[in-house]
Amino acid sequence: MKMIGYNRLGDNGRFGNQLFQYASLRGIAAKHKYDWCVPPPDTYKAANYGLFDCFKMSGAEGKVGYVPHNFETVDETTFAFDKEQFDSFPDNVNVDGYRQTEKYFKHIENKIRKDFAFLPEIMKPCRKFMKQFAGGRVVFLHVRRER
């Protein structure tokens, strides 16, 4: 069986990094028709592995676990999209790196959006909060401070 996984998902960066890493893993697997897996939701991770805590993650059903530790680890070769690596990605490996570009998963965008749909218990208070702005213009601003 051709399989790839991301054993360090949740250890390599924070929550935003996890989103890219999960989506890229799925995108690489889909392109090459590989099976794939991610760490189980109850795995303790120092960086607060929390994809299953707030998102439906419907595409990950039956896809939790680890690839064997004897699988080679394939890290990113650059911080930019590596088309050559993407097109020739080997099977039976552990994926690593940040992979912070949608180019790894744009071809399965709808599946990723479905996985990253918020759980009802997250959406309910958000909808309640947003009712106070009904009919008005709302702008959300995210400021990222670097060290």
What are these regions (language model features)?
Residues 1-3, 33, 136-138:
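A general structural motif
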Residues 1-12:
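Nucleotide-activated donor-dependent transferases that construct or modify glycoconjugates
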Residues 18-30:
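Histidine-anchored nucleotide/phosphate-binding helix
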Residues 27-34, 57:
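Short helix-loop boundary/capping segments at the starts of domains
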Residues 41-147:
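Secretory-pathway luminal glycosyltransferase catalytic domains
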